[in-house]
């Protein structure tokens, strides 16, 4: 179970083997620590040392996401000391395995972009432009496959160039299905200046915590990436693996709640150079993302949740690095 603690005046405490949630000092709920897989903190409040210790003892991640859609911190049990996996991960930076994985991440991302546009085209009468952009996006898959499996440092610029072209075409089609009132003209990344980008950023932050957990449990180093180059303090491997899941989990969810008017432009306000999501809209988005993570699809002939697929991909990456088990990025046809 993923537990969300939001709003103001909330506190998280411990009672025996339970996590207790309070509001303005009054107990409002409690849960057995062993039943919690992760806690998302999205409001203003506090957490006791005893609660943190109990969470760590039960291997429960505690993740704080601020209103800008940035992960402020992630608290977890001590790192799993899997030296063999990490050693192979570092060695892979100097050989063809790094290029193989970098290509796999981007190929899966582009395949999912193609899939999302296919879904959009099926549900709309005016779909010619979406189909046109989908075909352009699809062409980039072949370009990725043609790149040599060599050290990622030697092909990174080529991979990112192809990824950038595909993303430009994808976001152009994405924008075409949104009402003009949203003023969405393309993906802007961090520092969102419009409501849709702020929703995307927040949604990505929610699944980023899932990616961290997958990498941690697989014994991998989150700061040693293959597609995204190393930079001090940057969790490059987290940004690598999340590329496979943005479209199916977050992009589709944001499109759904916006186009169904479950969220309106009135649910946002300017705060300095940022667009701030009001609490009601933020709660709705988090609930929809968590519902998506818990929903199940057919994957390798099994009915499995998106959360478990994310865990599987981390383990598969570790198996590829240590045992040569082929790594295939996660993607769907639709």
From Swiss-Prot:
Any one Pfam family here would be Cas_Cas1
List GO BP terms, alphabetically. Answer: defense response to virus; maintenance of CRISPR repeat elements
Its required cofactor(s), as named, are:
Mg(2+); Mn(2+)
Q: Which UniProt keywords apply?
A: Antiviral defense, DNA-binding, Endonuclease, Hydrolase, Magnesium, Manganese, Metal-binding, Nuclease
Per the record's keyword annotation, is Hydrolase included, yes or no?
yes
Please name every pair of cysteines joined by a disulfide bond in this record.
none
InterPro entries named among the record's database cross-references: Cas1, CRISPR-assoc_Cas1, CRISPR-assoc_Cas1_C, CRISPR-assoc_Cas1_N
Return one GO MF term.
Answer: metal ion binding
Give me the residues that bind Mn(2+), please: 163, 228, 243
This protein's assembly is summarised as: Homodimer, forms a heterotetramer with a Cas2 homodimer.
What exactly does this protein do?
CRISPR (clustered regularly interspaced short palindromic repeat), is an adaptive immune system that provides protection against mobile genetic elements (viruses, transposable elements and conjugative plasmids). CRISPR clusters contain spacers, sequences complementary to antecedent mobile elements, and target invading nucleic acids. CRISPR clusters are transcribed and processed into CRISPR RNA (crRNA). Acts as a dsDNA endonuclease. Involved in the integration of spacer DNA into the CRISPR cassette.
PANTHER family xref list: CRISPR-ASSOCIATED ENDONUCLEASE CAS1 1
Family of the protein in this entry: Belongs to the CRISPR-associated endonuclease Cas1 family.
What the entry lists under HAMAP family is as follows: Cas1
Q: What is the recorded name of this protein?
A: CRISPR-associated protein Cas1 2
């Amino acid at each position: 179970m993923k537990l969300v603690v939001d709003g103001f005046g909330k506190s998280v405490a411990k009672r025996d083997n339970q996590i207790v949630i309070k509001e303005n000092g009054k107990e409002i709920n409690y849960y057995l620590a062993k039943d919690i897989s992760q806690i998302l903190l999205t409001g203003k409040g506090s957490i006791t040392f005893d609660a943190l210790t109990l969470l760590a003892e039960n291997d429960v991640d505690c993740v704080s996401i601020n209103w800008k859609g940035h992960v402020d911190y992630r608290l977890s049990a001590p790192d799993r000391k899997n030296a063999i996996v990490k050693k192979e991960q570092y060695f892979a930076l100097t050989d063809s395995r790094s290029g193989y994985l970098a290509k796999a991440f981007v190929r899966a991302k582009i395949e999912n972009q193609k899939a999302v546009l296919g879904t959009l085209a099926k549900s709309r009468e005016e779909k010619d432009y979406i189909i046109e952009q989908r075909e352009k996006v699809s062409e980039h898959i072949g370009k990725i496959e043609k790149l040599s499996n060599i050290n990622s440092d030697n092909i990174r610029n080529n991979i990112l160039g192809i990824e950038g072209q595909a993303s430009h075409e994808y976001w152009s089609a994405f924008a075409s299905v949104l009402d003009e009132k949203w003023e969405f003209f393309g993906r802007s990344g961090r520092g969102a200046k419009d409501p849709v980008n702020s929703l995307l950023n927040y949604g990505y932050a929610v699944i980023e915590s899932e990616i961290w957990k997958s990498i941690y449990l697989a014994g991998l180093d989150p700061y040693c990436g293959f597609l995204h180059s190393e930079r001090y303090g940057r969790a490059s491997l987290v940004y690598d693996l999340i590329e496979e899941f943005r479209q199916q989990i977050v992009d589709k969810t944001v499109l759904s709640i916006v186009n169904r008017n479950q969220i309106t432009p009135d649910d946002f306000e300017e705060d300095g150079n940022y667009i701030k999501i009001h609490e009601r809209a933020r709660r709705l988005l988090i609930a929809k993302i968590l519902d998506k993570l818990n929903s199940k699809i057919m994957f390798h002939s099994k009915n499995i949740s998106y959360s478990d697929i994310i865990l599987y991909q981390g383990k598969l990456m570790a198996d590829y690095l240590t045992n040569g088990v082929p790594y295939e990025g996660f993607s769907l046809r639709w």
